[in-house]
Amino acid sequence: MDSRASGTASNGETKPVYPVMEKEEEEGTLERGHWNNKMEFVLSVAGEIIGLGNVWRFPYLCYKNGGGAFFIPYLVFLFTCGVPVFLLETALGQYTSQGGVTAWRKICPIFEGIGYASQMIVILLNVYYIIVLAWALFYLFSSFTIDLPWGGCHHEWNTEHCVEFQKTNGSLNGTSENATSPVIEFWERRVLKISDGIQHLGALRWELALCLLLAWVICYFCIWKGVKSTGKVVYFTATFPYLMLVVLLIRGVTLPGAAQGIQFYLYPNLTRLWDPQVWMDAGTQIFFSFAICLGCLTALGSYNKYHNNCYRDCLALCFLNSGTSFVAGFAIFSILGFMSQEQGVPISEVAESGPGLAFIAYPRAVVMLPFSPLWACCFFFMVVLLGLDSQFVCVESLVTALVDMYPRVFRKKNRREVLILGVSVVSFLVGLVMLTEGGMYVFQLFDYYAASGMCLLFVAIFESLCVAWVYGARRFYDNIEDMIGYRPWPLIKYCWLFLTPAVCTATFLFSLIKYTPLTYNKKYTYPWWGDALGWLLALSSMVCIPAWSLYRLGTLKGPFREPPPRSLQRIRQLMCPAEDLPQRNPAGPSAPATPRTSLLRLTELESHC
């Protein structure tokens, strides 16, 4: 295990000292590894946080919640929750050199459940997020043709209700009240072959299963050698989507009607700020798009060198992420404005979010463009890459957590590769359920409950409370100062102490109050047991935090049978950081290393150890 203490180098600079790992070396334990350079870390994090949510969720939320006015609550959550928690998790990983579970064990054992909660979310996320890649691959392969298969009603999967929009007047080639478009029929009858409910799963869609298998094979080989392979792959997977986004942006803004679409995207409606739902949407979008509370940032940060300037990296990555979301809105809504003008319908009828944008709205727009197969290939290749690096970083997060929990088992030759293979195979097999004819209903359950904003908010509350109030915000600032050479902006510390837990708690409670049962396509209502299954998925992660704390308290040997002073002292031991964490030398670089307790202020000594 990569344990570190501090010492003084010959040039007077305080450096972490790595103790000799005699037992592990005797047993042939491999080194944990580091990024070869800063760029690998930056691109890996960028690939993780800049994903599908930037393209198919943020622009729609802007349009839905008051256009430019939505940026007000978005920026509030960005600076009170997004940036502080982003820095907290990244710095925690860099400071402890541990994954998403053991990092929390080292700074506060009683809150180790935070790590288990985040990994439970990642386990569920790994199963269903990659399904989107399977769909995107299916569309990508279907785009290698002269005429796109969702462009007309003459295919075997089309029904008599299939009608096409006239490009000029928006009228339908028919008068049926049940009329559907070829894009929707391709999605529901060719790709999904969707059944009438979750109770009828039906047959497995073998074509999608092969696409899912291909996605998992690509994901496996992207991370099978750890940071050595991941650091190289992200040079392509994290940068090429930007090229595609720029190409689509240039094409979009040059289309007729683009200005109208961009106006709908940005025109501010300040009255929407009085709606609490707007603020909840802004908060959940921050947590979705910044990949916080998943353990991914902790895992990626743990491969940094000790003196890497994680504070500067975090600020740059946060603003890059938000900027990408903003620019993606221009690319998407310029296309939607073009659709609105060509079909002669309001933009509200073509604006969609989530899979509806990627697999219905945008494919419909592509059909109207010259050289439509080319633009379809560009778009779906971008979707695949946006989802791919987010997926394999999540798998890397889980694998890193397991390896750090059991280093003597997995940190040996070929053991890590076998572990990744096992995770991939199990996740693939479970994911096949979502590729049945009723699999879309299962997918929505996972998406709505398993990795919902509610779960992420719950974890964020305890993360900020643990670091700020139990471990000590000032002490964590001391740790960051020891790593980067200066103290971050003081506002971030006060966010950890007050703003982040308060804002997250308020948003969490509001999401409970405003909870509405899940529906599909605003028509199908899930049975009671479907909602119950969804809540079990949500609680599977949230329950880890209190359950672990109660377990640790319950396994203390006799604390409640001893006098109160001694029992409290034993409980405080569960709140004490590990002794082998890097130690800051407060006396100056020329002074000898000091015990860890000399770093604590009086109040921290009394409340911790």
UniProtKB/Swiss-Prot annotation:
Whether Cell membrane counts among this entry's keywords is: yes
> Which residues are annotated with the PTM Phosphoserine?
598
The molecular function terms of the Gene Ontology recorded here are:
gamma-aminobutyric acid:sodium:chloride symporter activity
- Compartment(s): Cell membrane; Basolateral cell membrane
Q: Which residues carry this modification: Phosphothreonine?
A: 594
The record places the following residue ranges in the Extracellular compartment, namely 142-206
Q: Which CDD domains match?
A: SLC6sbd_GAT2 (cd11507)
Cytoplasmic-side positions = 1-40, 549-609
Q: Does the keyword Repeat apply?
A: no
Keyword list (alphabetical) reads: Cell membrane, Disulfide bond, Glycoprotein, Membrane, Neurotransmitter transport, Phosphoprotein, Symport, Transmembrane, Transmembrane helix, Transport
Picking any one GO biological process from the record gives: amino acid import across plasma membrane
What is an example of a Pfam family matching this protein?
SNF
Q: Where is the composition biased (Polar residues)?
A: 1-13
Q: Which reaction is recorded as catalysed by this protein?
A: 4-aminobutanoate(out) + chloride(out) + 2 Na(+)(out) = 4-aminobutanoate(in) + chloride(in) + 2 Na(+)(in); taurine(out) + chloride(out) + 2 Na(+)(out) = taurine(in) + chloride(in) + 2 Na(+)(in); beta-alanine(out) + chloride(out) + 2 Na(+)(out) = beta-alanine(in) + chloride(in) + 2 Na(+)(in); hypotaurine(out) + chloride(out) + 2 Na(+)(out) = hypotaurine(in) + chloride(in) + 2 Na(+)(in)
Region of interest (Disordered), residue spans: 1-23
Q: Which Cys-Cys disulfides exist here?
A: 153-162
List all annotated glycosylation positions. Answer: 169, 173, 269
Write out the similarity annotation.
Answer: Belongs to the sodium:neurotransmitter symporter (SNF) (TC 2.A.22) family. SLC6A13 subfamily.
What is the stated purpose of this protein? Mediates sodium- and chloride-dependent transport of gamma-aminobutyric acid (GABA). Can also mediate transport of beta-alanine, taurine and hypotaurine.
What protein name does the entry list? Sodium- and chloride-dependent GABA transporter 2
Species assigned in the record: Macaca fascicularis
Show the taxonomic lineage: Eukaryota, Metazoa, Chordata, Craniata, Vertebrata
